[in-house]
Curated annotation (Swiss-Prot):
Keywords: Ribonucleoprotein, Ribosomal protein, RNA-binding, rRNA-binding
Listed name of the protein: Large ribosomal subunit protein uL4
UniProt xrefs under HAMAP family: Ribosomal_uL4_B
Encoding gene per record: rplD
Organism whose genome encodes this protein: Frankia casuarinae (strain DSM 45818 / CECT 9043 / HFP020203 / CcI3)
Source organism superkingdom: Bacteria
Amino acid sequence: MSRVATSDPSVTARTVAVHAPNGGEGGSVELPGGVFDVPLNIPLIHQVVVAQLAAARQGTHDTKTRGEVRGGGRKPYRQKGTGRARQGSLRAPQFTGGGTVHGPTPRRYDQRTPKKMKAAALRGALSDRARNNRVHVVSSLVSGETPSTKSAVTALRTIADTRRVLVVASRSDELTWKSLRNVAAVHLLDPGQLNTYDVLVSDDVVFIEDALAAFLARDTRPATSTAGTEAAAGTEGVAGAEENK
């Protein structure tokens, strides 16, 4: 993961090239500044990522107390006259095979995180990658209509030759999904699944062109009066994506 930038540049739209499967450029596309060029809030990103990882925990851990362990129903020896410390059960915590004191029990680790906070964290993570020229757009990764892992990986390496790449492709794009779903260094996500954690743990983010359009157009509700100068389409698109997490 690259070092996150802490600069606070003015919010401006970015123009990036649209790459073709053969490695050439087939035009350009504009990345809205409200999504790809916003100030980075590291404490916010930390809070959102911690909450996301906590929510992924199963929480099914369980231990048995002295009342749940099998056996230990009778008093091991009489109360007085033995010279030993009095004991009431062989399943007390101090005995081998006894119950556990204050052990973990099933619980939920969910943390409530407002949608706007998750959306802002995702914008910050995407902006950091964009400022370091690590957000790319491709028209397609495979030429033709037949899935090809070799062709897709070759095209991907000409764009982002890094250790871990996040590829955002629509679910309907079976060509991309079938070509890359078995590549260990590539993580595939639908536009609606895009989240802060996966952006941060990836070195580069590669959008298929139609997936980028779907991400930015997702849930395009008009901006409210308190939204300030946020780009309505881009901001709500991020919120819509994080809502599914």
